[in-house]
Amino acid sequence: MGKDNKKQTMLDQAQPRLQVEGLAGRRGERLLFKNMNFTVDMGEVLEVSGHNGSGKTTLLRLLCGLLLPEEGTLQWRGQPINKIRPLYHSELSYVGHTDAIKGELTAHENLMIAGALNGGGIDPEQALERVGLTTIRELPGRFLSAGQRRRLALARLLVNRAWLWLLDEPFTALDKVAIRTIATLLEEHAAAGGIAIFTSHHAINIAHARTLEISA
């Protein structure tokens, strides 16, 4: 077996785990946090809390590779992320502030495309049902309310099978029923062995979730 094949076998056998050591994040000239350390294992949910501007979004952008760390290391399956980027990105799903919904496509078509690009999860029809959007399946994205767009963006998590969910303020614009629905999806993802990290500026009741507080 070649060296590259051995390395891939070791990665495949290593359990999903995200490890952060000595991480520092900056926005412009302002240092938001430094010497951040935490580990998230299979079956865990981590809520990142803090006031607006504390660095929650910056942290998620660092974790998903949209920003480079000022200092520190990020590891996935025991390997530095910068050495296994294709694998890492194939095993994560990121939902940011912008919902990335295509306005000219229906809700169902948006999920169909997401499933075709990545896939491995449940059927788009089932995903719409899980987030309570079956009645607007044929409505173009440009006509969806802010809450409906948010739920549709989160439904993409269900059609794209990924070990790691990175969610920036996933409960924004949602009513109490929708908040409970999405919280349940996070709990089920963890129960199936997945990892979820989400930001929030107010308390969300998710079973067995840990909290990481970012304070300036």
Swiss-Prot record:
Keyword field contains Nucleotide-binding: yes
Keyword Transport appears in the UniProt entry: yes
List, alphabetically, the InterPro entries matched.
Answer: AAA+_ATPase, ABC_transporter-like_ATP-bd, ABC_transporter-like_CS, ABC_transptr_haem_export_CcmA, P-loop_NTPase
Keywords from UniProt, A to Z, are:
ATP-binding, Cell inner membrane, Cell membrane, Cytochrome c-type biogenesis, Membrane, Nucleotide-binding, Translocase, Transport
Membrane topology, as annotated, equals:
Peripheral membrane protein
Q: What SUPFAM superfamilies does the annotation carry?
A: P-loop containing nucleoside triphosphate hydrolases
* GO BP terms, alphabetized: cytochrome complex assembly
Main localisation: membrane
Q: Where does ATP bind?
A: G50, H51, N52, G53, S54, G55, K56, T57
Q: Enzyme group, top EC level?
A: translocase
Signal peptide region: none
- Known catalysed reaction(s)? heme b(in) + ATP + H2O = heme b(out) + ADP + phosphate + H(+)
Its localization reads:
Cell inner membrane
ABC transporter domain spans which residues?
18-216
For this record, the Gene Ontology CC terms, alphabetical, are:
plasma membrane
Q: Name one GO molecular function term.
A: ABC-type heme transporter activity
Enzyme Commission code: 7.6.2.5
Q: Fetch the NCBIfam families from UniProt.
A: ccmA, PRK13538.1
| Protein family membership | Belongs to the ABC transporter superfamily. CcmA exporter (TC 3.A.1.107) family.
Q: What does this protein do?
A: Part of the ABC transporter complex CcmAB involved in the biogenesis of c-type cytochromes; once thought to export heme, this seems not to be the case, but its exact role is uncertain. Responsible for energy coupling to the transport system.
The subunit structure is: The complex is composed of two ATP-binding proteins (CcmA) and two transmembrane proteins (CcmB).
Q: What is this protein called?
A: Cytochrome c biogenesis ATP-binding export protein CcmA
